[in-house]
Amino acid sequence: MESLSQHTPMMQQYWKLKREHPDQLMFYRMGDFYELFYEDAKKAAKLLDITLTARGQSAGKSIPMAGIPFHSVEGYLAKLVKLGESVAICEQIGDPATTKGPVERQVVRIITPGTVSDEALLDERRDNLLAAVVGDERLFGLAILDITSGRFNVQEIQGWENLLAELERLNPAELLYPDDWPAGLPLEKRRGAHRRAPWDFDFDSAYKSLCQQFATQDLKGFGCDGLGLAIGAAGCLLAYARETQRTALPHLRGLRHERLDDTVILDGASRRNLELDVNLSGGRDNTLQSVIDRCQTAMGSRLLGRWLNRPLRDRAVLEARQDTVACLLQDYRFESLQPQLKEIGDVERILARIGLRNARPRDLARLRDALAALPQLQTALSPLEAPHLQALAGNIRTYPELAELLRRAIIDNPPAVIRDGGVLKQGYDAELDELLSLSENAGQFLMDLEAREKARTGLPNLKVGYNRIHGYYIELPRVQAEQAPADYIRRQTLKGAERFITPELKAFEDKALSAKSRALAREKALYEELLEILIAQLAPLQETATALAELDVLANLAERALNLDFNRPRFVEEPCLRIRQGRHPVVEQVLDTPFVANDLELDDNTRMLIITGPNMGGKSTYMRQTALIVLLAHIGSFVPAQSCELSLVDRIFTRIGSSDDLAGGRSTFMVEMSETANILHNASERSLVLMDEVGRGTSTFDGLSLAWAAAEHLAGLRAWTLFATHYFELTVLAESQPVVANVHLSATEHNERIVFLHHVLPGPASQSYGLAVAQLAGVPGPVISRAREHLARLEATSLPHEAPLREAGKPQPPIQSDLFASLPHPLMEELARLKPDDLSPRQALELLYSWKTRL
């Protein structure tokens, strides 16, 4: 860039600020607009679809420029944040009236995808997370900060696979990692991932900074004193949050150590396949959360989303939640709680904005209404006997002083921002009331003064007025000017009149002319004082918000249990998974016909079900509903089944459906095999495994061999396994593996048309019905007829399904040539024909040299 001296004074100011924020788009306030210049302007014009223009010249070149009206900036910021961009907001802090040259400007806040807190820029029912990671390929420290709630979690994770799975679960808006990590890492593909200096992750400075933030001598009380890598990552997050927010962060009050051992682990593929909160098309319709989320508050919805994505293995916690849901179902108690919870609103994020000192007037109005609703909610909770409910009620305190303060201070429907005033009630502050009265009632004062002066002087043509140059005045016609009282001081002489000022009018002028600006300054100061009073109470208020969110989720689970006919599952020590009349919670909501419920029984003697049946027969639905029932049980919810008895699981794996990973250069079959490999390496006897059509992406015998070996391996692991397949050969596994049983989805044909019955019955399916399904899908009749001919021929010549089962683990000669095997080298054929005894030593040597040149 050219020397600053070559630029105009304003551009010099711009470049000094821009150099401090090279990675952010600079919104540079000029009057009623935020302007962007140079490359920022070009980028913003493209991203926001705004006009790119030019502004004069600086350093001999025209300046590319794009502008955004300041009053509509929120919409543009929201779009940029969604696109993963960061913005530095540069405001005018000097007074243009008293400044020579460019008005003083300063970057007052930095908006990044992971640190945004403005309500307009956030999805109210989704967490917005900032993450940092440090370590090596063996062990990583991961820290997660939700600046909109104050949640600050750390954990240490072994291996890339587990780290990437955890990042997929958390889906942070921004991810920070050390600048000295090599290029080409998997996490670089994530939107919002960017590098930070290695020293930002330094343990010693991080430890000191965190202790200072939490006002503690050490971090032992948070259970993370020994997590060196995680503490380094947390220190990086804290520094980044301070850098972007430009304020203290009083709502960050501690760390929480998360342990993978406490949770049911789901990898990224399982999370996608089960469509917990995002469907396979990337939307939110027809997901598990869309069905079971009727929370009354946004913070409740966010908590439910965290529960779904992080099921627990703590039986005591799960049963306490179940007891609470049962208590709320009794006499329909949840019905009286939910309307009260709706009045509470999103207290969690309001408190965070108060902590960040950027709470809007409407935030305080909502907090006022929430605090006013708490006493009635406390009364409703007091007779409820569930221990966990009582614990929650203990944290839902009432705040009569704060409630009264906000009631007195904030008008019923305040404006969106404090900038133009009009937020505080009349009577809250006497000085503000006087200033507002002066500002708003100047006209009436002047009318009253004019009437009094006419009466006092007896001059009927006297007028009181205002001039921007000379201020307030009393005007008399020139012929009456000599009759002016002694206290009239001449201010201005006109052609036909004289203007005067009096001590009373001068005193009023001094007050009135500055009253509006002074009133606004006073109101802003009082508003800041209100925020400070609330900040002093943040700790108990945040505990209350946390308890309210959980109460909302549990009341929601009670409502869903009643209206969706969910029943309480029972956890047992005996290894088992028994479901009576289980249903898919999402599919049953979208069907026009009644859902066909089915049983499932797995125990120590039966660990695997081989599931056969026609396409569209319901195999995948049956498998997914099992996983969703198990998952719902592990968040403390009731489940869509007549009854359910299960032992705790450690992981849920799914290998259901695949698509090409074009960006990663992986075929459908490669994706399928990668997911299968992950399951075979990590499943245990406490894992639930769903395997659907393993091996279908390659040749028949290769696919069958892989599916067979995978099923044998899982049977050996004794994992809870549902293995759906079209390879009927696998049904003979039940004869050699005592923990394997066969079931099938029933169907029948009528008048050459297939009827799916969707009942799960013991034993293998009798036939595939593939041609009937093809006919149902609209495949042309001649193609179906020709397919029947081919099928008859293939069934007559193929190996029978009853071929004897070879022993597992013993390699056998291939029964199908490998399409990718190399053809025999011609030299091998010559060598096979060669008779060594017929060669002389010289001939043998010449032949050897000849072969060597041909290799």
Curated annotation (Swiss-Prot):
Keywords for the protein's UniProt record, in alphabetical order: ATP-binding, DNA damage, DNA repair, DNA-binding, Nucleotide-binding
GO-annotated biological processes: mismatch repair
NCBIfam families hit by this protein: mutS1 (TIGR01070), PRK05399.1 (NF003810)
Matching PANTHER family: DNA MISMATCH REPAIR PROTEIN MSH1, MITOCHONDRIAL, DNA MISMATCH REPAIR PROTEIN MUTS FAMILY MEMBER
PROSITE patterns: DNA_MISMATCH_REPAIR_2 (PS00486)
Residue intervals passing through the bilayer: none
Family, per entry: Belongs to the DNA mismatch repair MutS family.
GO molecular function: ATP binding; ATP-dependent DNA damage sensor activity; damaged DNA binding; mismatched DNA binding
HAMAP family: MutS
Pfam families according to UniProt: MutS_I (PF01624), MutS_II (PF05188), MutS_III (PF05192), MutS_IV (PF05190), MutS_V (PF00488)
Alphabetized InterPro entries for the sequence: DNA_mismatch_repair_MutS (IPR005748), DNA_mismatch_repair_MutS-lik_N (IPR007695), DNA_mismatch_repair_MutS/MSH (IPR017261), DNA_mismatch_repair_MutS_C (IPR000432), DNA_mismatch_repair_MutS_clamp (IPR007861), DNA_mismatch_repair_MutS_core (IPR007696), DNA_mismatch_repair_MutS_N (IPR016151), DNA_mismatch_repair_MutS_sf (IPR036187)
Gene Ontology cellular component annotations, sorted alphabetically: cytosol
Binding residues annotated for ATP, in chain numbering: 613-620
Summary of the function given for this chain in its UniProt record: This protein is involved in the repair of mismatches in DNA. It is possible that it carries out the mismatch recognition step. This protein has a weak ATPase activity.
Entry protein name: DNA mismatch repair protein MutS
Superkingdom of origin: Bacteria
